[in-house]
């Protein structure tokens, strides 16, 4: 975590949005869980929402890499951005991690499916609003999938919504 903190200039900042990408298998989810646990140990409330894995899969990964997940980390397996927004409020989250943005959808934009450019941009926009426009500032990490050209899958404009774009290069 100290290396991550160094790369982002001293650690995550509340009211900031960070996009984290890598090729498949590059360690995005593992790094995000590690960040979650480290933040929770500092007393922060963390919401980790996965649209790709079940809660038991997330817990299994956390047990494998961390031995145990801190009680201040709330794990959520759901691809509804509406539910993520509600959970962020209910858990009084200081840090929200969404893994990965291309798997989430807002009900307002259905029947457009998760991964559709409109859904991806609108979901990211909601996360920016959580970070910067809520009652309290929140740090947000958006995990993004890369395409075969090693670019962030979806719209390039997604990168412009973030304060920091990080690419894990294998």
Tell where the protein language model's regions lie, with residue ranges:
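Short, solvent-exposed loop/turn segments at secondary-structure junctions
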Residues: 104-108, 112, 146-153
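Amphipathic alpha-helical transducer elements in NTP-driven molecular machines
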Residues: 1, 5, 14, 29, ...
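Flexible beta-alpha connector loops of hexameric P-loop NTPases
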Residues: 21-24, 69-78, 105-121
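Structural recognition of the conserved hydrophobic beta-strand(s) that form the central parallel beta-sheet
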Residues: 48-50, 75, 96-98, 137-145
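The Walker A/P-loop phosphate-binding site
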Residues: 1-69, 85, 89
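Short, ordered loop/turn segments at secondary-structure junctions
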Residues: 23-25, 51-54, 79-81, 100-103, ...
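Phosphate-binding/switch region of NTP-binding enzymes
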Residues: 121, 125-170
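Proline-aspartate-enriched helix->loop->beta-strand connector
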Residues: 88-98
């Amino acid at each position: 975590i100290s290396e991550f903190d160094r790369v982002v200039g001293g650690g995550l900042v509340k009211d900031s949005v960070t996009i984290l990408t890598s090729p498949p298998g590059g360690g995005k989810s593992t790094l995000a869980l590690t960040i979650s646990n480290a933040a929770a140990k500092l007393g922060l409330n963390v919401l980790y929402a996965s649209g790709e894995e079940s809660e038991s899969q997330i817990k299994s990964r956390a047990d494998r890499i961390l031995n145990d997940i801190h009680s201040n980390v709330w794990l959520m397996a759901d691809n509804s951005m509406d539910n993520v927004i509600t959970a962020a409020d209910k858990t009084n989250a200081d840090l929200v991690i969404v893994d990965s943005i291309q798997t989430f959808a807002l009900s307002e934009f259905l029947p457009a499916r998760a991964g559709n450019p409109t859904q991806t941009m609108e979901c990211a926009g909601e996360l920016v609003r959580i970070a910067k426009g809520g009652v309290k500032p929140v740090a947000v990490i958006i995990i993004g999938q890369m395409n075969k050209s090693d670019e962030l899958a979806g719209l390039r404009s997604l990168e412009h919504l973030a304060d920091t774009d990080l690419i894990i290069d294998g």
